Amino acid sequence: MSDLLERGSLPLVKSWLAITFANEEDLPFQVPQIADILVHQKCIERLGTSENALSVRKNWCTSLTKMLQSKDFRIRWSAIILIHCTISQSWDCLVEHGATWAKLLIALLNRPETPKTLEIAMITVSKMFSSTVGRPAVTRELVTPNLPTFVNNCLRIAESGKCLCTVCSCLYQGIISHSPTFRPFVSSIRNICIKILDGEEVVPSSLQKKAAVLYASLYRCVGKGNFEDYWKQSIISILKEYHLTLDFLFQFVIEPQTYPTREENLMFPKLKGHYEETYQKALHRCRTLNLILISFLSTKTDKIVLLPINALKDLIQRVYTVQLSLPVKSVESSVQALLFMVLPHLHTLVNELTLKLFVVIPPAIILSFDSYLDSLNDCLLSESTHTGVLCSSLKLLSKFLDVTHMNVPLSKYENIVTLVLEYLANSSKGLASKSIEFSKNRGHSQKKRKTLSESQAGDTLMSSEESHQLYDSDVMDCCFSFLASILTHSIALPRLLRTKIDLCTLQISLSNPTSTVLISMHNLLLASILSPGDSQAVIVPHAIRIISGPLGLVHPDPLVASHARSSMQTIESLIHPRFPPLQKHLSPSEFENTFESRFEPVSLENQSHISPPQVDSQSEYKESSILAPSNPPFETESITDSTEIEGIKESFASTDTGLQNNSTATSENKRSESELTMSNVLSNEGDRNEEGSEINSSQPSTINHGTDHINIVSENKETTVSLLHGDVEVEETTNVALNNSQDTETKFTAIDVDFVDRPTSVVSSQIENINGDENGNTTSSVVETFEKTTDVVDEKTTSINVEGNGEDDEEEDNISLPSINLESDSDS
């Protein structure tokens, strides 16, 4: 096989046709190796265009067609895999034989094949259909006659409960590629999704996510004219289902506000029965609806869609307002206990939905995040023992701090930080007590045992098993990430609180944390080092000991070791900074040449013809220049006598002394004139800046950051949104539009936005004063030369003004640049 690989693709394919395909009994065992070579070597694509190569390719496709009609299911399975590898690299094979293969593969879906054969057949047909996008001729020949039959067969397989993940993936791929053809099958596909999501059977989370994404993509099957309206109607119908489910769960709670909903055009079956029997099903439906809403916000949209942002905020606020302290109706204690048991799960779902909204359209959440912080405080204080509430709340707060870089007041998160520190302290105490018990039991048991090797092995197993059961690594990871965000973005923390954070970090390092927790711990140590603050002790030596020891560089996990290596490089750059190299010392001759090339000699004779530079008051910070004389500065003949040279030197020295005295005397007389000139220039610049600010205030403000930007514009009733990414984790260009309207919708273009520090601008100004001496000669002296670095957007000058009248939300971004004060220096 290696010799054939070295010769090229043509001999290799010939050998497969002559030897491997002829032996059908051993063919299924050779298919994995052949498929791997086809994928990596691109053998069919590299056959060439010669007559011999075209003949070999035709024989290859004909052999696959014959194998696909075999009676042996193993041969059919082998043919499907090889067909999938062939169409992935050869467009000619797809055009010539794709229609025949598609009919045979779709016919296989009606046969009692094995689940693996059905899955690979559906994947291959879906690959054929998606490859014809943008080619109308091939689409009419291959897709149009075969796609309806393929969809019917897939739905029949899904109803039987087989290959559900593959069916959802293939249907979603078909909707993305050929959405108008799926219009007759919208209701059937929706019923399949509801059966998977809201059924009584327990399904894996991966299947639930695929079904939710498929449900959120059905709006594409409508005509192009109703694209945006159907997307909006779909998400509003899910919100209506959510409110109806909450009505059932909160039927015994006296809510401060009512949310009436009409029970019409519902997609999910109505909840019936007693509260004790149906509350679990209602909670499961809330999880399903929350997953569908997140899928709507995450999937890609080809056009701008309308997002009812206020309706989503109402849903979030409704769940947040229901706390354990709210009054309830006179019900049995068992029903009240069930209600209190449901609340933490609902708060976790709302935290996840808020986090997704914050990723998709940050301005809508930032402007109302103050009320969310109060609700999060109440939830965490009353439900701190629930892992989901704690993790989701900390993730939301960390994301808010990392994206906005805002200095939130300490009163907003002080209780949350205290709660996190208490959790870490309890975890460290539990680890310490368990380690003491293990050591005592090990010492007592070693006396009874006969062999040392058995005791060491048993103690090792016990300690490793117990150490992983003492705390939840996900919760520890969220706690460390939240504390790192607090240290990074909080300017002033109390000394006691800051000391507690460092102590808890060091105490947890004494245990045996997992790899994920170790990486978060390294980030927290770096955040503590990079943000010193007011603390009682220095944490740098302890951080170096942890990161360079068994919990860092020497850790067996390569991810932990690589992260520790980068952390150590950061710490080393802080402790031992490297200054730039010194410049090479020049010889006297080179130094004189460099000096003469940079400075021109000033003429001491005939300076009356030099005109002073004209200061243009209409230009912005233009540098004045001294005009050099047209004649050569020195017209000398060859000097050979040393006495003449000494006399010339003395004359130059006396002339320089006179010039310095003259310039000192005239600078005192002309100081008022220079100050007047500076004030005139600044007044002109101030008027110009005021005019520019008035002009810019009427235009939409834009905040640019690399490739990510936010365009805040004013529209009439709605704000537009276009979700340009199908994956939640991908960050791309963001265009967010906020409105000054009375409508409850928002149009957006977006997935994720990041706010960073703004670039700085260097402003330089050089103004020269032309002084005259008693003889009428002019002398140019620099009045002021300075450089001032200012931030283009400062925290003190940046403000977001939000004004609202009743239910109308009016959102504006007013960004003002800091003024630059230029004052003349009297000592210039």
From Swiss-Prot:
The keyword Transport does not apply. Coiled coil: none annotated. Pfam families: RIX1. Residues 604-707, 794-828 are annotated as: Disordered. One of its GO terms (biological process) is rRNA processing. GO terms for cellular component: heterochromatin; nucleus; rixosome complex. Residues 805-814 have a biased composition (Acidic residues). Component of the RIX1 complex required for processing of ITS2 sequences from 35S pre-rRNA and the nucleoplasmic transit of the pre-60S ribosomal subunits. Regulates pre-60S association of the critical remodeling factor mdn1. Also required for heterochromatic gene silencing. Belongs to the RIX1/PELP1 family. This is Pre-rRNA-processing protein rix1.
